């Protein structure tokens, strides 16, 4: 069977909370298109100039072309800080009306029909193409930004899709695709074990503290040392190339390409956060939609680009009033360093990114995909590709593998598996296929890993299906990400009773049923059902809601117990006052012995016994209360 093309992408999700209500009040988001297109035009004629300007500003803030202006502005700043006069990091798509370069374009992956148009207005999809002459090309071909304004949860759910491999394999050996998969698995392993948590604070500390400036250089030096150690040990030393200088240059370029790409994504997220949490986004647009002249930095290398990006982040996104410092003496190894970073992340509100999920797309010469057995039978390369993508741990290249196989070990295993005499068990392979199958279509087959973080798409060359998986992952991963954040706060800070109602409301807004519109994309429902069967996300949300409600009920009972304590104390005080009032009323006479009559003594004795019982009840209640709390 002929392999035509390989695409390998990483999907990295994020979310932005506390989105300004302005974006959900926009007329463009109104569910009735008849209202927008007809009635609104009539209303406009009756409005004053001030009211009309306000209405227009509400309409403008969510328009696709305005979001392009906002994102392109930050890309222009990035370009001015990086690259060289002859080679920008990104391709220029066109020139705007001010004759300035535009580096980002809107892409319409789905048709806007009447049924899903309401949701289409809240879906945004953009593409940034990397300059083929840029060092970023060593790592990524293009960056796709997709996000959705979630009205129910009042959040922005988004993801970056990094296209890492996009090559024709018609004139190459099929085994070359396994090399591409290995290298990108190694990059993913590094990111998840060295860069996580993926946030601004993973790279940057307080610039006003001189010791932290030194710490930043040490941090980058440590990352680069670990990168070189990993790549030379696992890959470069296993190659026949003996030119160490050339390998070192390749390794350095790849390192800076990876780090700078992630910084660019974090900058983009911060720009989205600033815009979508603003109470006056129209003012931001007015400032941006003007001719801006940005100073071009002189020609520089990838390392200088890294420090320029960090300086840009320090000046624009890190809080000036927040002293985020770290204990330099305490940090002795990477684990302690990550612990310090986690502490700083808790103190700031900068956004972070999730683990990279993987989508591998293979185009083959095949006209009928109805039968998985027919497609895979006697196709050892295809069977092996399925195994490596869906179960990478078995081949020693898993994201969390405690031991990551080197290239020689991996290559020998590949050659062994591709040997027809090795006696591969097709029956066991069929079981793996049945467990991982996601969709069966005449034009394609798709598969999902057991942790629902990896997809394999096998298709012919005339069908586009990857967008369905990008949006399905976006829907699920942002929800998983929010739940993880809630759980992290829960276990790190304990049950904060003041947040019960807010957490319950947020979780209920994230819950879903299979009758939901799913961003207006009915084509992703089947994919999400399969993801949920692996991850149990739907059930997890419901269980967490029930847990918070249970804790809320316990908290309510605790409050009732506290009120009961106050009631007992009040009764105790009132009882004692009445008791002594009665005693002094009886005894306060001119003749003391006159008050000591039998009836009075009986009354005083009974009152004393009752007072004693009240004291005993209060003491026992106090001890029991302490026992319950502990």
Swiss-Prot record:
Its main location: membrane. It is a multi-pass membrane protein. The keyword Manganese does not apply. It is found in: Cell membrane. GO terms for cellular component: plasma membrane. The chain crosses the membrane at residues 254-274, 504-524, 564-584, 601-621. Keywords: Cell membrane, Membrane, Transmembrane, Transmembrane helix. This is Uncharacterized protein MG242. It comes from Mycoplasma genitalium (strain ATCC 33530 / DSM 19775 / NCTC 10195 / G37) (Mycoplasmoides genitalium).
């Amino acid at each position: 069977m002929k392999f035509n093309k390989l695409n390998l992408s990483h999907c990295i999700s994020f979310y932005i909370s506390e989105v300004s209500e302005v974006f959900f009040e926009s007329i463009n988001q109104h569910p009735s298109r008849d209202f927008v297109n007809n009635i609104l035009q009539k209303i406009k004629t009756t409005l004053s100039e001030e009211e009309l300007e306000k209405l227009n500003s509400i309409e403008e803030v969510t328009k696709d072309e305005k979001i392009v202006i906002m994102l392109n502005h930050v890309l222009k700043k990035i370009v001015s800080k990086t690259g060289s006069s002859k080679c920008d990091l990104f391709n220029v798509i066109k020139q705007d009306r001010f004759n300035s370069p535009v580096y980002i374009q809107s892409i319409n992956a789905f048709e806007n029909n009447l049924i899903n148009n309401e949701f289409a207005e809240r879906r945004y999809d953009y593409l940034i193409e990397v300059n083929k002459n840029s060092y970023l090309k060593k790592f990524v071909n293009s960056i796709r930004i997709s996000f959705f304004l979630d009205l129910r949860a009042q959040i922005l759910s988004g993801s970056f899709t990094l296209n890492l491999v996009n090559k024709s394999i018609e004139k190459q050996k099929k085994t070359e695709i396994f090399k591409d998969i290995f290298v990108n698995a190694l990059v993913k392993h590094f990111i998840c074990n060295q860069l996580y948590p993926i946030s601004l604070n993973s790279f940057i500390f307080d610039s006003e503290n001189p010791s932290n400036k030194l710490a930043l250089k040490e941090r980058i030096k440590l990352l680069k040392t670990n990168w070189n150690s990993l790549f030379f040990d696992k890959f470069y030393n296993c190659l026949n190339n003996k030119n160490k200088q050339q390998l070192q240059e390749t390794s350095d370029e790849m390192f800076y390409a990876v780090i700078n790409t992630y910084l660019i994504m974090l900058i983009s997220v911060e720009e989205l956060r600033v815009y979508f949490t603003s109470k006056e986004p129209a003012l931001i647009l007015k400032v941006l939609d003007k001719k801006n002249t940005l100073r071009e930095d002189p020609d520089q290398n990838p390392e200088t680009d890294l420090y320029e990006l960090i300086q840009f982040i320090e000046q624009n996104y890190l809080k000036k009033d927040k002293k985020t410092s770290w204990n330099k003496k305490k940090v002795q190894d990477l684990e302690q360093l990550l612990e310090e970073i986690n502490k700083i992340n808790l103190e700031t509100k900068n956004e972070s990114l999730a683990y990279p999920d993987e989508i591998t797309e293979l185009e083959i010469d095949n006209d009928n995909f109805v039968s998985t057995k027919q497609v895979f039978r006697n196709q050892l390369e295809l069977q092996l590709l399925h195994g490596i993508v869906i179960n990478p741990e078995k081949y020693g290249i898993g994201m969390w593998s405690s031991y990551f196989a080197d290239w020689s070990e991996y290559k020998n295993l590949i050659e062994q598996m591709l040997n027809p005499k090795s006696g591969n068990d097709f029956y066991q392979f069929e079981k793996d296929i049945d467990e991982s199958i996601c969709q069966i279509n005449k034009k394609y087959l798709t598969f999902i890993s057991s942790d629902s973080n990896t997809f394999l798409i096998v298709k012919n060359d005339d069908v586009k299906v990857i967008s369905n998986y990008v949006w399905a992952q976006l829907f699920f991963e942002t929800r998983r990400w929010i739940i993880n954040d809630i759980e992290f706060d829960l276990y790190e800070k304990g049950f904060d009773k003041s947040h019960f109602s807010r957490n319950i409301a947020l979780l209920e807004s994230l819950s879903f049923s299979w009758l939901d519109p799913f961003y207006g994309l009915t084509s992703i429902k089947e994919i999400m059902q399969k993801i949920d069967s692996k991850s149990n996300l739907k059930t997890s949300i419901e269980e967490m809601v029930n847990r918070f409600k249970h804790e809320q009920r316990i908290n309510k009972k605790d409050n009732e117990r506290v009120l009961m304590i106050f009631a007992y104390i009040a009764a105790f005080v009132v009882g004692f006052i009445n008791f002594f009032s009665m005693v002094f009323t009886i005894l306060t006479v001119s003749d003391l012995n006159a008050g000591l009559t039998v009836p009075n003594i009986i009354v005083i004795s009974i009152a004393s016994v009752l007072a004693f019982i009240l004291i005993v009840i209060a003491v026992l209640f106090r001890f029991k209360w302490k026992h319950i709390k502990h």
